[in-house]
A protein has these predicted regions:
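General structural signal for secondary-structure boundaries
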Residues: 109, 119-122, 153-156
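Short helix/loop segment immediately N-terminal to the Walker
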Residues: 142-151, 175-177
Length: 197
């Protein structure tokens, strides 16, 4: 199908026996990062265009939903979490250096100068940003019915909120602007129910 003779099997660099691609400095580590940021760039372009256009609320809501989706995945992929491994002092030191950090945020109005010094943001700052995008999208898409299945509806927005709160429920740290622990789990259940209904 499609001229790909390997359509029904893993590519060589994904075989477990060839784990060099899976190392921290291997091919797979930047794969998601690079592709998600390409999608974020496109969402930012759409947001920028919507900001300059009359009647582009739906485009803005769709773009903010997709951007929130990307950052939610990136935050979960690159949030350094403790692993159960044999004693490795270097691992513990490296973990402490990035504990609670996710990925850099690139907004539609981020300048090139800001990009040159754009460090990883805290988990709290990232999820605050994600919820800002989802809340805006929820308002803008309140009366929107997607024309195709690849565009977000309110159910998608509620589902993304449920996923975000479910992730935050696994943390015991207290944040001023986003819930964690049981409070986050309750919100995850609430938004999951909204997505289903």
């Amino acid at each position: 199908p499609g001229g790909n003779q390997y359509y029904d099997r893993w590519q060589a660099w994904l075989y477990p026996g060839n784990s060099t691609g899976l190392a921290a400095n291997g091919k797979m580590s930047p794969f998601f990062y690079t592709n998600y940021y390409k999608f974020i760039f496109t969402a930012n372009e759409a947001i920028d265009i919507a900001n300059q256009s009359e009647g582009a609320e739906e485009m803005m809501g769709i773009a903010k939903t997709f951007r929130a989706l990307c950052y939610l995945d990136l935050a979960r992929l690159y949030d350094a979490l403790p692993a159960k491994a044999p004693e490795r002092p270097a691992y513990e030191t490296e973990l402490e250096a990035v504990k609670g950090l996710t990925v850099p945020i690139v907004r539609e109005d981020t300048s090139m100068e800001e990009l040159e010094n754009n460090p990883r943001v805290s988990r709290e700052e990232m999820f605050k940003f994600i919820f800002e995008d989802l809340n805006t999208a929820e308002t803008l898409l309140a009366n929107y019915t997607p024309a195709t299945k690849n565009l977000p509806s309110l159910a998608v927005i509620y589902g993304l909120k449920a996923r975000a709160y479910l992730w935050l429920g696994g943390f015991t740290e207290s944040y001023a602007e986003v819930p964690t622990g049981d409070a986050a789990y309750r919100l995850a259940a609430e938004y999951a129910r909204k997505a289903i209904d």
